[in-house]
Each structure stands twice: as C-alpha cells, then as structure tokens.
Regions:
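Cytosolic regulatory regions of ion transport systems
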Residues: 1-348
C-alpha cells in the first residue's frame, strides 16, 4: 500500500512535544498519549525508592484494585518489563527487580498516583534551562508558554541572529546569546536553582558534554542523542535521560504502515515490541470472545480497553465487543498476527 499523501511528520515538533509531556511526569522516561490523550504510556525505571521492588505482578494488580468503589481503583496496567536489555511480557508470578524498565498503560487522570505508587514523588518542574534554540528548543519553549506557563524557562543559543529571532517570538522566556558550556552564562541563567537542563543542540557530543556540566552544577539533565551507540553508553557516561528523535519519528510512521484499524503505535526497546491502540470492527475475529478465549498471539498483552465512554482493566472473562478500543503490547514477531485480528475482511 502507498503511504498516504497527507502524512507529513515534523521530527523537531514531535520531539518537542515528547519532551513537553515528560515534564508533566518528572521521573518518567517516556510519556506517550493514546486514545486522544485519555490514556498515557509511562516508561519508568524501578529504583531503590520503589516500594514495589520484589512484589509480584498479581499482588500489584490486587493493590491497584483494592477499593470496593471501583471508580477509586488505580487504572494502570504493567504491559512489559525490560531487564538486562531483554524485553518480556511478565507473568502474574513475576516480581519487579531494581533496575527493571517497566512499561505501564494508565488512565491520564491516574498518572500522578501511578508515579507515586512506583516511588516517584518528584516535585513539579519550576525552572528549566534549554541549551540550543533550534527548532526543537524553540517549539518546546512555545509549547511551555502556552500549556505550562508556570514553568520559568531560559534558552541559551549560540547564534546571535537566531537568538534575536526567538526572543522576538517568545513573550515569557529569557533568551541568552552565547555558548551553552560557558559557566558564567549558565550562572546568568541561574543554573544553581534550575530543576532541569535540556541539551537540545544538533550535535551529540556537545549535548553529552553539556550533561556533564549540568551534573557538575548538581542539575538534572535530559539530552538529545541521534547516534544510538551513545544511547547504549548513557549509564557509563553518567547521562540521566536520553531522547532519541528517530524512535519518536518511526512510531509516528508505523501507524500508517500497519494493516487493520490501527489508531496509534509506539515502538519500544529498540523495536523489540510495539504499544498499539486498535479498534474492534464488526468483521473482527475477536467479536463476542472473552479475553482468555481470544486468538491473541503469545507475544501480546492487553493493557486497557475503552468500552463506549468507560476505560477498564480487562479480566479473563471480559467480553470483546464491536467498537471496543484495545490498547496492547505486541512483541515484534507477532505483529502480523495481531494485524489480522483487527483487519477489515476486504483487506485479506
């Protein structure tokens, strides 16, 4: 099939939006919206502060669903765990281990509670420094002025003309012209009081050095890295968080590559799996089947289902009905099998 002609993707804009979402959930590695922003995928690292270390998934599920009033239950579902660079779909008896990277599908209204349940009670970002006033940094600053105006933002841009341009375009952002590695300039940006520094230049090596400067100033950092080899070395290099623009762009394209009623896709863990939002059509093989009886491939885990206007965590006996919207993790080897379940018959 040909790619739709109206598919226009701006990588810089998508990356800026991705970072802006991360700022709403400090501590998360990814915050990805699904179902018109009703659901979010969180990726978190299980650290020493997590109270759920050594807890089995069945116990975590029971903990999230312990309220007699179901509306108060935590609508969050662990879809996958990455351990020692291997992604797997956990069984109910599996336990969380320190260092695990977990992927959680959660109702957007329960993001803060979910973060807290996993030991992330970071204070909201109040002061932010952006190094690099290119398209990513500029678009991010614009979004923050519009959607998170309570955050104080400073941009350091090396090019004088570009500095003047973005200063003219932004109304509530401090724009400084100079080298992002200049300690005097960082002091002028008040790095000592900053909650986060973003290294968003178009040079990987510069961004890595900037992260080291941020660490020296006891400031958390997020950096953009285009070379995946650097991404693999982030722990050795002491980098706290890395944004990979290619991963974000690929995920936007995947929706249009898949067959069937696929609404959105996000690739995870070096494309070992995908998080998919798909709609059940009247011709689907899944209609009127319970979750446990559905023909889901082995490498697929259903996280949440939207039935009409209600979002639920499905049980084994949950019946799949027409127009249900299903959010699931699917390992790459089983993607084609999953596509078949959501295809219109005429597409076979």
């Amino acid at each position: 099939d040909n790619m739709p002609i109206d598919l226009i993707i701006s990588p810089e804009l998508e990356v800026a939006r991705s970072i802006e979402r991360q700022l709403k959930a400090p501590g998360a590695y990814d915050v990805v919206p699904f179902l018109n922003d009703e659901i979010e995928l969180l990726s978190l690292v299980i650290n020493e502060k997590c109270p759920l270390v050594d807890t089995s998934l069945i116990n975590i599920h029971e903990l999230f669903q312990e309220n007699a009033d179901t509306e108060k239950n935590l609508r969050a579902s662990i879809l996958g765990i990455s351990r020692d660079e291997r992604l797997f779909i956990p069984k109910k008896q599996d336990t969380l281990t320190q260092g695990d990277h977990v992927y959680i599908m959660v109702d957007k209204n329960h993001v803060k509670r979910t973060m807290s349940a996993f030991g992330y009670d970071e204070k909201p970002i109040q002061k932010l420094i952006i190094i690099g006033g290119g398209n990513i940094g500029f678009n991010l600053a614009k979004d923050l002025e519009k959607y998170q105006s309570d955050i104080s933002v400073s941009i350091v841009e090396n090019n004088e003309d570009r500095s003047k341009y973005i200063a003219d375009q932004l109304s509530n952002t401090l724009v400084l012209n100079g080298d992002g590695l200049d300690q005097d300039l960082l002091d002028e940006a008040n790095i000592k009081d900053a909650d986060l520094l973003l290294a968003l230049t178009n040079d990987d090596e510069t961004n890595i050095i900037i992260s080291a400067v941020a660490r020296k100033n006891k400031c958390e950092s997020i950096i953009i890295v285009n070379n995946s080899e650097y991404n693999k070395l982030k722990d050795v290099l002491g980098i706290s968080k890395v944004v990979d623009p290619r991963k974000i762009t690929v995920s936007k394209i995947l929706k249009h590559v898949h067959k069937g009623k696929i609404e959105s896709v996000f690739a995870i863990d070096n494309n070992q799996a995908e998080i998919i939002h798909a709609q059940v059509l009247k011709s689907s093989k899944l209609i009127n089947k319970n979750i446990e009886d559905a023909d889901f491939p082995h490498g697929l885990r259903v996280g949440l289902i939207k039935k009409e206007d209600k979002i639920i965590i499905p049980e084994k006996d949950t019946k799949i009905e027409i127009h249900d919207e299903i959010l699931f993790l699917c390992m790459s080897d089983d993607i084609k099998k999953a596509e078949e379940l959501f295809q219109v018959r005429s597409e076979y």
